[in-house]
């Protein structure tokens, strides 16, 4: 009798085991096939407004300060979440077969930064021999804003649609604020302080693979510098540059010649170019590069305007800044912005072959 009771109890307990066992792995977020966006709501709201509305906001000091304080120029991560299983968990995220994140952790959530826009990503979570797989997409909405700790206004030049409907390649050219502070100009003079944190340095040089740092600042701003704040493995090209109407003057033209030659050397990629805040000198170069690639006028102005999330002062506005940039090219030969900017660049001595080489580097294949 005792044996029968004992056997019955064991069988009853065995029947309950599936209830007690760890639930199977299940991906929670993003949902399979979901489209996610790494722009902040404030960024998306601004980009959705008309050009007239955006122009008005750039001269609104209350709005400008609030945007810098509340949104700034940093993106949101894509947060991966899952449930069930027993840690540690092996997590892998890939893009077209290329691994962009591979980590092991005990938690059931992880943030993924700096994903390309308009892409499909696959992700897998494995635990104790069991795996759950899913996919998600990133929204087709530029700019691709980048997370590089303690460096503001970092954006991928790529992601927009250019000539012939070809997308500008992502991961090749970045624009940013300075990678260090400006030097102290008065005696006793002091070199600028590196802005990149250890994490930011890893992201810039390992994750993003920066090879060249094109510094558009003046000699006084870069006093004492002998190389890139991103380290000895990053080539530092210091080309003191002009902005806006300065493109009409010889000094501004000579500087742009040096800058564009750097973009024609495939060994330099990936490239980050910047001035102090990534606004005026950087915005001027970005405008020319994007225009040569055939990015349309609305996207050209949005790329320039986006600096408003990093720089709160209303002097950075269209009147006297962007309008002056447009005036540089307005009377040049050409029926559209791309052709007018081509005329400017070819007037500096570059050839059709140079422009085609730049486009071959920067535009995705048809």
Region roles according to the model:
Residues 1-6:
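Positively charged n-region of N-terminal signal peptides that target proteins for export
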Residues 21-272, 284-366:
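Cys-dependent protein tyrosine phosphatase-like superfamily
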